[in-house]
Amino acid sequence: MIREVQGIILMLVGIVILRISWGTAYLDYVKESMRPWLLASGAILVILGVLALVDALRRGGVSEAEAQRSDEEIVFDGVEGDHDHAHGGPRAAWLLVLPILVVFVVAPPALGAWAAARDTTNSVAAQQALPPLPPGDPVPVFLSDYVTRAVWEQGVSLEGRTVELTGFAVSTDDGGWQLARMQIQCCAADAFASKVQPVGLPPDFADVPENTWLTVTGQWVPGDAAADGSPGATPSSSAIPLVQVGSIAVVPEPVNPYD
């Protein structure tokens, strides 16, 4: 690979990073707080690509082999097979094209029902006491927050309150569905699902296609859908709490699909 192409690829990778982080597409992959770092990384790659391209153009008549030998300071005189070793790096640089193709051809969506259905961790124990819910009903609550309060606090802070939960439908083995939403700490690679089991569904919502986004308004009731009907949401990372449905509506996917 000639040095000009190396510089162009660096610029393209930087442009792709800037493109997805300038709008809201980056929220499908990382937390909102990562945006400044993405913008900085994209800008640095673009600058490095421009510098590499300018340097290649300045060299003009210098052959690719000579330029590479000068840059890497390879001195293997008399050693057989040096030529192949020297060109291993430039060949590997073609891998930088992959993220460009992924974003422009088959950009992956945010994690949804497929990932949630295969996740057995539904919550993690709170490290400290959770604050009371704000006044006023219904109160919007993150799905992960609802699960934590229902499981690890036995629903104490939810009792008698009407909550509003937003997530996507995940099919269950018995032909029903659960409301789920993925939670991330840093990026999609460390995501896990928070799921609740709606009970008392109206007939129109008995069967909902997977990945349909819904807002459920209702109240906490004791129970654990992961315990085969056993009473009580026992403190367990796999427990799936219940929510008694008061109303339900199909909604657009949020700009930020993660909790």
Predicted stretch roles:
Residues 1-259:
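OB-fold and OB-like single-stranded nucleic-acid-recognition modules
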